[in-house]
């Protein structure tokens, strides 16, 4: 097949599209001399983080025997001494070779200290030069080690740890390994570890990240004497520039996901799925703008502020940036309310920041049934009102199949979300229209008004999904 398009996006992970198109790419580690990265090696290498599969077990309520298949790889307690795989290892594992032993132990325990689901450290990197072509061979070895690990957990009686897995039956073993690292396509800028540790705010920022600089052992599980991950933690977040999302030498190629333009240490943070997701959203918006202006990705640079404002409009977040949309009438309105809590004054719905940051509310905090009033000196034909509600970004949501972790998650709609909203429009004191939002389950809610003339709107959050406070983080208003 031959596909023709003005712009392509390589979101393959392996940089497959870019590779076949002749895009410049990198693999392995850059030397410290190239970017001055704190944790870079003195010499370049072809190390890569490995592929992983997971396994899942179920408590049957009675003892269950396990006989390993013939291909299972035998593992000893000594070999797994650096791999947390049961609660008892909380007190015995030696993390002294971690840059931050206590933080490492805490974060590792979150996902590994159970026998019913794991393990992120079940990781292999292959034997050759190209982890991509070795994918199936690595998969076969991973499956063999997965059964070997389960055999160890079920049947090993020689170690110092009691695994307490007598009643557990192996329920599922993954068949498609997750990939952490392969090719990185080169753009006009390579994000480095230095940028991350310095929390750099780029003028052309279109995405942000906050995961630690998380490099795994060079040979994965087979580095038995090493901790599986070398996590370098830091406070705060960093931004990723637009220049890291398009190819340096293929003029109509974007990248999104883990194949964006970074050093290997940059990838150690940006590869996390949440960062990949919001970077993909930014690239999608950028591609639409390329269509609007009939230009290539690099040629879109003069319009990067428009791109940033569109990201914010869609409830994206860019540290160091705020809503400056000239079409947003809320930025020019007089705003008050029937009541509010200290720190959650009504005018903050138009301060340009749509989420709580530290102790700063950045929004109107009140009780259900109260009214926010927005006025203008002249009549507007209101077409759309965009409401951004509190959804509790501070609540940890873990994407996992672990029964223990799933039991800790709240089900359903966040209780903090406003559920029912009434919107009233007035012109010279007379009502000209109204709109309702019922059973809302979204953080960003767009309400089409239909070009109603008004010089005043009133927003009444009538109920929430359970919380006592009703919180409106942002309110945007657009006219005909």
Q: What are the roles of these predicted feature ranges?
A:
Residues 460-467:
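Short beta-strand-plus-loop segments that form exposed binding edges in beta-rich domains
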